[in-house]
Amino acid sequence: MKTFLKPILSLSLFGLLLLIYACPKHNTWDYEEGHFSTTPVNLYFLNTQYDDYNSALNQSGETFGLCFSSNRNSAGSDFDIVYKFVNILYDWETKDLYIGTPKYAGSNLEIESNSLHNAMLKINTNSDEFGPFMLPLGTKESTNNQNWGIYYANVFLFSNDENGNQDIRFVENQDQEDYNDAKPIKFLNTSFDDAYPSFNQEDSGMYFCSNRAGSFDIYFAKVDFTGHDWPAIFSDTTQKSIQKMDSLSSDSADKCPFIIGNTMIFASNRPGGFGGYDLYYSKFKNGKWSKPINFGSKINTSSDEYRPVIRREEGFDNDFMIFSSNRSGGKGGFDLYYVGVEKVPW
């Protein structure tokens, strides 16, 4: 496995699609809101003694899928992208918060699981897969009677080093139930390592990290995504304007950008942190990114913290962030943790 990825977390978090499209984004709650711990909590039910990191996420719903990179399948060798389902339940009367595996599995969960399983068959190889990011395309009619006549269409982005360096690739099932074979996004990739794509809220481009200029920095590719014809856009080989984001990058390694709303979160081992890789955030305002701010000692440690992703959660007074860390007290290697953070504006 390539040295730059040894400690990397790759998370992808997404809500069950029926919940995404059925639930309003802004609710008025007639009861007390829930609260996520502002001290990191180990997600023991997801972790193993191996390295578990790198996730991706989408919004809404109390049950959601979490895709992340793990070397559990190879007993510590190469990394694959795996998925688990997470259930968040808050009892407004008892104030009990449950975060764990789903207590009940219905047809929606089974259909989503089938879709994820089929995607992983196309994504995973004998090389290392990292940095999953999922774009949901909604439900479509299925010819498979086992899926109640529907299937979930998605585009999955990830990186893979089967050519010797990390390249960003994608699989999709926009027009057919089975996912296509993985294809490279040629306008992003170089002979260096390119990974961890994320998109701005204006649909005007995507951010990613690369060591094409030496150390890892954060880059922006100007691409028009307003039509949301993702497979066609990612298959385009036309050269794009790509620039290093000096306001976000440092002389050290800056990796794993993830954007939600006007906020970018990422990992960096720049000076001034608490040791190893720390988590930082930046706000986009008046056409530019603010100076990155360290999340502080309540989240960061002298060990490594990697690949943060945030999920908005209605009915709570803060948002839900998942990240990876090799801090002491876990199951071994890198574990996944969650922590409550200040709500990100819509």
Sequence positions of predicted segments:
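Bacterial N-terminal signal peptides that target proteins for export
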Residues: 2-12
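Short, conserved micro-motifs composed of acidic
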Residues: 24-346
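C-terminal motif of bacterial Sec signal peptides marking the signal peptidase cleavage site
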Residues: 19-22
